[in-house]
UniProtKB/Swiss-Prot annotation:
It comes from Nitrosospira multiformis (strain ATCC 25196 / NCIMB 11849 / C 71). This is Deoxyuridine 5'-triphosphate nucleotidohydrolase. Pathway: Pyrimidine metabolism; dUMP biosynthesis; dUMP from dCTP (dUTP route): step 2/2. InterPro entries: dUTPase, dUTPase-like, dUTPase-like_sf, dUTPase_trimeric. One of its GO terms (biological process) is dUTP catabolic process. NCBIfam families: dut, PRK00601.1. It comes from the Bacteria. The gene is dut.
Length: 149
């Protein structure tokens, strides 16, 4: 298992570091490091601190901040930016944009799990300018072109 540097910015997390829930989990839960219960009204979005900072340091890695499926499905709480991208050289606190797309106010409790962090490999590329591409089977056929079923 690869190790990355983590900085605890909120002392309440000392005993609750992000961890994989099961041996097959891809995401590490991120928590809302807020002092009091916060009400997120329908249509509102708030930046929520997670109380941690990470430094991946390896340009071959990035981290994705993804929504928790239960919050979105049951309560309409999703990420305002849909997906967060943390570059390998970022060292600041991780924040989560929580957007209430539901119809009812949502009460966010201190230290509630609000998102997942997934570390992924990254390939940096360069571009070679060409006049034409070698023909592929699909070509330029886009949206819906591969069929419905």
């Amino acid at each position: 298992m690869k190790k990355i540097d983590i900085k605890i910015l909120d002392s309440r997390l000392k005993d609750q570091l992000p961890a994989y829930a099961t041996s097959g989990s891809a995401g590490l839960d991120l928590r809302a490091c807020i002092e009091h219960v916060m009400t997120i009204q329908p249509g509102e979005a708030h930046l929520i601190p997670t109380g941690i900072a990470i430094h991946l340091s390896d340009p071959g890695l990035a981290a994705l901040v993804l929504p928790r499926s239960g919050l979105g499905h049951k309560h309409g709480i999703v990420m305002g930016n849909l997906v967060g991208l943390i570059d390998s050289d970022y060292q600041g606190q991780i924040f989560v944009s929580c957007w209430n797309r539901g119809q009812a106010p949502f009460l966010l409790n201190p230290l509630e799990r609000i998102a997942q962090l997934v570390v992924v490999p990254v390939v940096q590329v360069g571009f070679k300018v060409v006049d034409d591409f070698e023909q592929s089977e699909r070509g330029a056929n886009g949206f819906g072109s591969t069929g419905k079923h």
